[in-house]
Amino acid sequence: MSIPVPRPGIMELRPYTPGKSTAAGLGRVVKISANESPFGPSQKAIDAFHKAGGRMHRYPDGDATELRNAIGAVHGLDPARIVAGAGSDEILYNIARGYAGPGDEIVMSEHGFNVYPIVTHCVGATLVTAPETDLTFDVDAVLACVTERTRMVFIANPNNPTGSYIPADEMRRLRDELPGETLLVIDSAYAEYVQRNDYSVGIGLVDAADNTIMTRTFSKIYGLAALRLGWAYCPPAIADVLNRLRGPFNISTPAQRAGKCAVEDQAHVAASCDHNSVWLPWFASHMQALGLHVYPSVANFVLVRFPDAPAKNAAAAMAYYMERGVIPRETGGYGLPSCLRFTIGREDELRQAVDIARDFLAKS
Protein backbone atom coordinates (compact mmCIF):
# COMPACT_ATOMS: atom_id res chain seq x y z
CA MET A 1 0.00 0.00 0.00
CA SER A 2 1.36 3.42 -0.92
CA ILE A 3 1.63 6.16 1.69
CA PRO A 4 1.97 9.96 1.47
CA VAL A 5 5.52 11.15 0.91
CA PRO A 6 6.76 14.44 2.41
CA ARG A 7 8.35 17.09 0.24
CA PRO A 8 12.04 16.65 -0.61
CA GLY A 9 14.27 17.86 2.21
CA ILE A 10 11.69 17.63 5.00
CA MET A 11 13.10 14.42 6.46
CA GLU A 12 16.58 15.97 6.42
CA LEU A 13 15.34 18.65 8.79
CA ARG A 14 16.77 18.30 12.28
CA PRO A 15 14.01 19.15 14.80
CA TYR A 16 14.73 21.84 17.36
CA THR A 17 15.91 20.35 20.65
CA PRO A 18 15.00 22.52 23.65
CA GLY A 19 17.04 22.61 26.82
CA LYS A 20 16.28 19.91 29.37
CA SER A 21 13.79 20.77 32.11
CA THR A 22 13.74 17.59 34.22
CA ALA A 23 16.32 15.29 35.79
CA ALA A 24 15.70 11.59 36.35
CA GLY A 25 14.77 10.73 39.92
CA LEU A 26 14.64 14.34 41.07
CA GLY A 27 11.49 16.29 41.80
CA ARG A 28 12.75 19.84 42.17
CA VAL A 29 15.42 21.04 39.76
CA VAL A 30 17.18 24.32 39.05
CA LYS A 31 16.52 25.02 35.37
CA ILE A 32 19.08 27.39 33.91
CA SER A 33 18.93 25.94 30.41
CA ALA A 34 16.43 28.05 28.47
CA ASN A 35 17.34 31.71 29.15
CA GLU A 36 14.04 32.24 30.92
CA SER A 37 13.46 35.13 33.30
CA PRO A 38 14.29 34.22 36.92
CA PHE A 39 11.57 36.62 38.06
CA GLY A 40 8.75 35.37 35.88
CA PRO A 41 6.21 37.77 34.39
CA SER A 42 5.04 41.09 35.74
CA GLN A 43 2.24 40.77 38.28
CA LYS A 44 0.23 43.08 36.04
CA ALA A 45 0.64 40.59 33.19
CA ILE A 46 -0.43 37.71 35.43
CA ASP A 47 -3.54 39.60 36.53
CA ALA A 48 -4.43 40.43 32.92
CA PHE A 49 -3.99 36.79 31.92
CA HIS A 50 -6.38 35.58 34.63
CA LYS A 51 -8.93 38.27 33.86
CA ALA A 52 -8.94 37.30 30.18
CA GLY A 53 -9.89 33.72 31.07
CA GLY A 54 -13.55 34.65 31.22
CA ARG A 55 -13.53 35.39 27.49
CA MET A 56 -12.12 32.09 26.29
CA HIS A 57 -15.35 31.37 24.39
CA ARG A 58 -14.75 34.42 22.15
CA TYR A 59 -12.28 34.60 19.29
CA PRO A 60 -9.37 36.94 19.96
CA ASP A 61 -8.77 40.22 18.16
CA GLY A 62 -7.27 39.02 14.90
CA ASP A 63 -5.19 42.18 14.57
CA ALA A 64 -3.88 42.21 18.17
CA THR A 65 -4.68 45.93 18.12
CA GLU A 66 -4.21 46.81 21.79
CA LEU A 67 -1.01 44.79 22.01
CA ARG A 68 0.51 46.42 18.92
CA ASN A 69 -0.55 49.86 20.14
CA ALA A 70 1.15 49.24 23.48
CA ILE A 71 4.35 48.04 21.82
CA GLY A 72 4.30 51.07 19.55
CA ALA A 73 3.80 53.46 22.46
CA VAL A 74 6.66 52.00 24.51
CA HIS A 75 9.15 51.86 21.62
CA GLY A 76 7.99 54.89 19.65
CA LEU A 77 6.93 52.85 16.63
CA ASP A 78 4.04 52.96 14.17
CA PRO A 79 1.69 50.10 15.21
CA ALA A 80 0.74 49.59 11.55
CA ARG A 81 4.29 48.35 10.95
CA ILE A 82 4.19 45.89 13.87
CA VAL A 83 3.18 42.27 13.25
CA ALA A 84 2.40 40.03 16.22
CA GLY A 85 3.20 36.33 16.15
CA ALA A 86 2.77 33.19 18.21
CA GLY A 87 6.36 33.50 19.34
CA SER A 88 9.02 35.09 17.18
CA ASP A 89 9.51 31.58 15.74
CA GLU A 90 6.24 31.93 13.82
CA ILE A 91 7.37 35.26 12.43
CA LEU A 92 10.77 33.91 11.35
CA TYR A 93 9.04 31.01 9.61
CA ASN A 94 6.62 33.32 7.82
CA ILE A 95 9.46 35.57 6.69
CA ALA A 96 11.10 32.55 5.07
CA ARG A 97 7.76 31.41 3.59
CA GLY A 98 7.14 34.83 2.13
CA TYR A 99 10.53 35.49 0.61
CA ALA A 100 12.41 32.23 -0.05
CA GLY A 101 11.86 28.83 -1.60
CA PRO A 102 13.52 26.07 -3.63
CA GLY A 103 16.59 27.35 -5.46
CA ASP A 104 17.06 30.27 -3.05
CA GLU A 105 19.72 30.65 -0.37
CA ILE A 106 19.49 31.87 3.22
CA VAL A 107 22.67 32.89 5.02
CA MET A 108 23.37 32.67 8.75
CA SER A 109 26.49 32.61 10.91
CA GLU A 110 28.20 29.42 12.06
CA HIS A 111 26.80 29.32 15.60
CA GLY A 112 23.54 31.18 15.03
CA PHE A 113 20.14 30.34 16.49
CA ASN A 114 19.00 26.82 15.61
CA VAL A 115 15.58 27.92 14.36
CA TYR A 116 17.14 29.51 11.25
CA PRO A 117 18.14 26.17 9.66
CA ILE A 118 14.70 24.77 10.47
CA VAL A 119 12.76 27.53 8.72
CA THR A 120 15.19 27.41 5.80
CA HIS A 121 14.64 23.70 5.21
CA CYS A 122 10.89 24.03 5.77
CA VAL A 123 10.57 26.30 2.74
CA GLY A 124 12.94 24.23 0.60
CA ALA A 125 15.70 26.85 0.48
CA THR A 126 19.42 26.14 0.81
CA LEU A 127 21.20 27.09 4.02
CA VAL A 128 24.60 28.78 3.71
CA THR A 129 26.64 29.05 6.90
CA ALA A 130 29.34 31.70 7.28
CA PRO A 131 32.30 31.19 9.65
CA GLU A 132 32.53 33.32 12.78
CA THR A 133 35.49 35.11 14.33
CA ASP A 134 35.90 34.46 18.06
CA LEU A 135 32.31 33.14 18.18
CA THR A 136 31.07 36.46 16.81
CA PHE A 137 29.13 37.24 13.63
CA ASP A 138 31.70 38.20 10.97
CA VAL A 139 30.25 40.72 8.53
CA ASP A 140 32.91 40.16 5.88
CA ALA A 141 32.52 36.37 6.07
CA VAL A 142 28.76 36.69 5.63
CA LEU A 143 29.09 39.10 2.71
CA ALA A 144 31.48 36.64 1.05
CA CYS A 145 28.70 34.02 1.15
CA VAL A 146 26.14 36.19 -0.62
CA THR A 147 25.30 35.27 -4.21
CA GLU A 148 22.61 36.20 -6.70
CA ARG A 149 20.49 33.47 -5.09
CA THR A 150 20.67 34.91 -1.55
CA ARG A 151 17.20 35.97 -0.47
CA MET A 152 17.88 36.79 3.17
CA VAL A 153 20.44 36.94 5.95
CA PHE A 154 19.54 36.02 9.54
CA ILE A 155 21.46 37.61 12.39
CA ALA A 156 20.73 37.21 16.10
CA ASN A 157 22.10 40.28 17.85
CA PRO A 158 22.95 39.43 20.61
CA ASN A 159 23.56 35.89 19.43
CA ASN A 160 22.26 32.76 21.09
CA PRO A 161 24.09 30.67 22.33
CA THR A 162 27.34 32.68 22.34
CA GLY A 163 26.14 35.95 23.91
CA SER A 164 28.23 37.97 21.45
CA TYR A 165 27.02 40.97 19.45
CA ILE A 166 28.10 43.25 16.65
CA PRO A 167 28.02 47.04 17.12
CA ALA A 168 25.70 49.40 15.28
CA ASP A 169 28.30 50.51 12.74
CA GLU A 170 28.98 46.91 11.70
CA MET A 171 25.26 46.20 11.41
CA ARG A 172 24.90 49.29 9.25
CA ARG A 173 27.82 48.18 7.08
CA LEU A 174 26.22 44.78 6.67
CA ARG A 175 22.99 46.36 5.46
CA ASP A 176 24.77 48.83 3.18
CA GLU A 177 26.87 46.14 1.49
CA LEU A 178 24.10 43.59 1.05
CA PRO A 179 22.21 43.75 -2.24
CA GLY A 180 19.01 45.75 -1.97
CA GLU A 181 16.90 42.70 -2.82
CA THR A 182 18.43 40.68 0.03
CA LEU A 183 16.34 40.84 3.18
CA LEU A 184 18.19 41.42 6.46
CA VAL A 185 16.41 39.85 9.44
CA ILE A 186 17.66 41.17 12.79
CA ASP A 187 16.61 38.88 15.64
CA SER A 188 16.81 41.09 18.74
CA ALA A 189 15.38 38.62 21.26
CA TYR A 190 17.86 39.62 23.97
CA ALA A 191 18.03 43.34 23.20
CA GLU A 192 16.69 44.50 26.56
CA TYR A 193 19.68 43.04 28.39
CA VAL A 194 22.37 44.82 26.35
CA GLN A 195 24.19 47.64 28.12
CA ARG A 196 26.60 48.81 25.44
CA ASN A 197 26.66 52.30 23.95
CA ASP A 198 27.58 50.97 20.52
CA TYR A 199 24.62 48.58 20.29
CA SER A 200 21.46 49.17 18.27
CA VAL A 201 18.34 47.00 18.22
CA GLY A 202 17.86 47.68 14.50
CA ILE A 203 14.91 50.08 14.46
CA GLY A 204 16.89 52.72 12.58
CA LEU A 205 17.80 50.28 9.83
CA VAL A 206 14.17 49.25 9.42
CA ASP A 207 13.16 52.90 9.15
CA ALA A 208 15.92 53.66 6.64
CA ALA A 209 15.03 51.11 3.97
CA ASP A 210 12.42 48.64 2.76
CA ASN A 211 14.57 45.51 3.09
CA THR A 212 15.16 45.04 6.83
CA ILE A 213 13.08 43.44 9.60
CA MET A 214 13.60 43.44 13.36
CA THR A 215 12.03 40.66 15.46
CA ARG A 216 11.49 40.64 19.22
CA THR A 217 10.11 38.24 21.82
CA PHE A 218 8.13 38.22 25.06
CA SER A 219 9.77 34.95 26.13
CA LYS A 220 12.91 36.38 27.72
CA ILE A 221 12.90 39.53 29.83
CA TYR A 222 9.08 39.69 29.89
CA GLY A 223 8.81 36.15 31.26
CA LEU A 224 5.95 35.03 28.99
CA ALA A 225 7.64 32.04 27.35
CA ALA A 226 4.64 29.75 27.92
CA LEU A 227 2.28 32.10 26.06
CA ARG A 228 4.28 32.07 22.78
CA LEU A 229 4.30 35.75 21.89
CA GLY A 230 6.61 37.76 19.66
CA TRP A 231 6.53 40.64 17.23
CA ALA A 232 8.27 42.15 14.24
CA TYR A 233 8.83 45.74 13.14
CA CYS A 234 8.82 45.89 9.35
CA PRO A 235 8.53 48.11 6.31
CA PRO A 236 4.82 48.45 5.40
CA ALA A 237 5.06 46.14 2.37
CA ILE A 238 6.69 43.38 4.41
CA ALA A 239 4.15 43.80 7.22
CA ASP A 240 1.46 43.26 4.60
CA VAL A 241 3.11 40.01 3.47
CA LEU A 242 3.46 38.69 7.02
CA ASN A 243 -0.13 39.55 7.86
CA ARG A 244 -1.29 37.59 4.80
CA LEU A 245 0.70 34.54 5.92
CA ARG A 246 -0.14 34.39 9.63
CA GLY A 247 -3.20 32.66 10.99
CA PRO A 248 -6.32 34.84 11.31
CA PHE A 249 -6.42 34.46 15.12
CA ASN A 250 -2.80 33.56 15.81
CA ILE A 251 -2.52 35.25 19.23
CA SER A 252 -4.86 34.16 22.02
CA THR A 253 -6.73 36.77 24.05
CA PRO A 254 -4.88 35.89 27.30
CA ALA A 255 -1.54 36.26 25.48
CA GLN A 256 -2.56 39.61 23.99
CA ARG A 257 -3.75 41.00 27.32
CA ALA A 258 -0.73 39.71 29.25
CA GLY A 259 1.65 40.99 26.59
CA LYS A 260 0.11 44.45 26.65
CA CYS A 261 0.47 44.74 30.41
CA ALA A 262 3.97 43.23 30.35
CA VAL A 263 5.33 45.73 27.84
CA GLU A 264 3.72 48.60 29.74
CA ASP A 265 5.34 47.53 33.02
CA GLN A 266 8.82 48.85 32.31
CA ALA A 267 9.63 48.92 36.03
CA HIS A 268 9.58 45.11 35.97
CA VAL A 269 11.88 45.15 32.93
CA ALA A 270 14.27 47.53 34.68
CA ALA A 271 14.43 45.29 37.75
CA SER A 272 15.28 42.31 35.57
CA CYS A 273 18.00 44.30 33.80
CA ASP A 274 19.46 45.43 37.12
CA HIS A 275 19.61 41.84 38.36
CA ASN A 276 21.31 40.70 35.17
CA SER A 277 23.86 43.52 35.23
CA VAL A 278 24.99 42.39 38.71
CA TRP A 279 24.87 38.62 38.45
CA LEU A 280 26.12 38.04 34.92
CA PRO A 281 29.59 39.48 35.67
CA TRP A 282 29.54 37.80 39.10
CA PHE A 283 28.87 34.39 37.60
CA ALA A 284 31.34 34.88 34.75
CA SER A 285 34.15 35.95 37.08
CA HIS A 286 33.57 33.09 39.51
CA MET A 287 33.55 30.49 36.73
CA GLN A 288 36.72 32.04 35.30
CA ALA A 289 38.34 31.85 38.72
CA LEU A 290 37.90 28.08 38.52
CA GLY A 291 40.04 28.03 35.37
CA LEU A 292 37.15 27.75 32.91
CA HIS A 293 36.92 29.83 29.75
CA VAL A 294 33.87 32.09 29.82
CA TYR A 295 32.98 33.86 26.61
CA PRO A 296 31.95 37.53 26.87
CA SER A 297 28.17 37.96 26.90
CA VAL A 298 25.80 40.91 26.70
CA ALA A 299 22.66 38.78 27.10
CA ASN A 300 21.14 36.90 30.07
CA PHE A 301 23.35 33.84 29.76
CA VAL A 302 27.00 32.88 29.49
CA LEU A 303 28.74 30.24 27.42
CA VAL A 304 31.41 28.31 29.34
CA ARG A 305 34.04 26.07 27.75
CA PHE A 306 35.18 23.02 29.71
CA PRO A 307 38.50 21.14 29.37
CA ASP A 308 38.93 18.48 26.69
CA ALA A 309 39.93 15.72 29.12
CA PRO A 310 37.19 13.02 29.09
CA ALA A 311 36.60 13.20 32.85
CA LYS A 312 36.43 17.01 32.82
CA ASN A 313 34.73 17.80 29.53
CA ALA A 314 31.34 19.40 28.94
CA ALA A 315 29.52 16.07 28.66
CA ALA A 316 30.91 14.91 32.01
CA ALA A 317 30.10 18.29 33.55
CA MET A 318 26.53 18.11 32.24
CA ALA A 319 26.04 14.68 33.80
CA TYR A 320 27.49 15.95 37.09
CA TYR A 321 25.15 18.93 37.11
CA MET A 322 22.13 16.79 36.24
CA GLU A 323 22.84 14.38 39.09
CA ARG A 324 22.66 17.35 41.44
CA GLY A 325 19.45 18.75 40.01
CA VAL A 326 20.92 21.72 38.16
CA ILE A 327 20.27 21.87 34.42
CA PRO A 328 22.41 24.03 32.13
CA ARG A 329 22.17 23.84 28.32
CA GLU A 330 24.21 21.50 26.18
CA THR A 331 25.42 23.27 23.04
CA GLY A 332 26.65 20.41 20.87
CA GLY A 333 23.70 21.05 18.56
CA TYR A 334 25.14 24.50 17.91
CA GLY A 335 28.53 23.07 16.97
CA LEU A 336 29.95 23.81 20.42
CA PRO A 337 30.32 20.39 22.09
CA SER A 338 33.00 21.62 24.51
CA CYS A 339 30.66 24.17 26.08
CA LEU A 340 27.65 24.53 28.34
CA ARG A 341 25.37 27.57 28.43
CA PHE A 342 24.12 28.92 31.76
CA THR A 343 21.13 31.23 32.16
CA ILE A 344 21.60 34.04 34.67
CA GLY A 345 19.07 32.81 37.19
CA ARG A 346 18.48 33.79 40.80
CA GLU A 347 21.37 34.40 43.18
CA ASP A 348 20.97 31.06 44.96
CA GLU A 349 20.83 29.19 41.65
CA LEU A 350 24.02 30.81 40.39
CA ARG A 351 25.90 30.20 43.63
CA GLN A 352 24.86 26.56 43.46
CA ALA A 353 26.01 26.32 39.84
CA VAL A 354 29.44 27.71 40.75
CA ASP A 355 29.76 25.37 43.73
CA ILE A 356 28.95 22.36 41.54
CA ALA A 357 31.53 23.43 38.96
CA ARG A 358 34.13 23.78 41.71
CA ASP A 359 33.38 20.31 43.06
CA PHE A 360 33.36 18.82 39.57
CA LEU A 361 36.75 20.23 38.65
CA ALA A 362 38.28 19.27 42.01
CA LYS A 363 37.20 15.63 42.02
CA SER A 364 39.74 13.02 40.95
Language model regions located:
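N-terminal "arm"/small-domain region of PLP-dependent enzymes with the aminotransferase-like
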Residues: 1-58
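PLP-dependent aminotransferase class I/II
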Residues: 42, 211-295
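Phosphate-binding glycine-rich loop
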Residues: 60, 64-105, 123
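Short acidic capping loops at alpha-helix termini that bridge into adjacent secondary structure
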Residues: 78-82, 102-105, 149, 181, ...
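PLP-dependent aminotransferase-like
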Residues: 98-155
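Active-site pre-lysine segment of PLP-dependent enzymes
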Residues: 121, 139-148, 161-184, 188-221
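PLP-dependent enzyme catalytic core of the Aspartate aminotransferase-like
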Residues: 169, 316, 320-325, 329, ...
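Conserved PLP-binding catalytic core of the aspartate aminotransferase-like
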Residues: 277, 288-324, 340, 344
